[in-house]
């Protein structure tokens, strides 16, 4: 078996060596590079902040299920997992409205065409909000209808009030992510502190409320904190946008 693996490797290398790909790679290697990008000075100072911001959000979502599993049992933890999968899928779909515009936003910022930038961004944010709201409402209505008819599948999700709280948090988070994307297109990350504070407060809220009030308390606390943090993100967005655009005009 070991010889067979080595033979497939040698054959693959030989095929590359004899193909046009090898000549293309050799020509690319011979191209002289005049402009170099310093990862240490141009990329890393921005990327480590982005990494911390994303890790903070990831940390919050990964706490829900373990806490509920330990305090409320496997059934409730499974319901939370199913509900999170559904609403996160909706969030991922609706966020494509903003994520696909990142190259356009960045290009307009480079051209300093802030009027066109803001017009496009505002339209995109409205589309994102409407799409996300409609899909979240539709999901809630479907679960409510299935529960009314006692369809077993509906009881694999959280209760309707917990779902509503979670959907409020998801919708608020979508707006916060949209403003964060706008700011990051300027090659800056001013929301690092917001993200860390959000991770700590939401984490503590999850641990405390999940232990004493179950899924309903956990989702309610998360919704309240997410709305407050989104308002904070909006203030940073307004301040930084005004400051950066004034300096660059």
Predicted segments, located by residue:
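Helix-loop interface residues and adjacent transmembrane-helix termini in multi-pass membrane transporters
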Residues: 71-74, 185-186, 212
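Interhelical loop/hinge segments that connect adjacent transmembrane helices in multipass membrane
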Residues: 2-6, 12-59, 112-115, 240-249
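Interfacial/gating helices of multi-pass transporter permease domains
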Residues: 38-46, 50, 67-88
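Hydrophobic alpha-helical transmembrane segments
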Residues: 1-24, 201, 215-239
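Short membrane-interface helical motifs at transmembrane helix boundaries
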Residues: 134-155
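Helix-loop junctions and terminal segments of transmembrane helices
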Residues: 87-112, 185
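Interfacial transmembrane-helix starts/ends
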Residues: 40, 44-47, 81, 113-130, ...
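Membrane-interface junctions at transmembrane-helix termini in multi-pass inner-membrane proteins
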Residues: 168-195
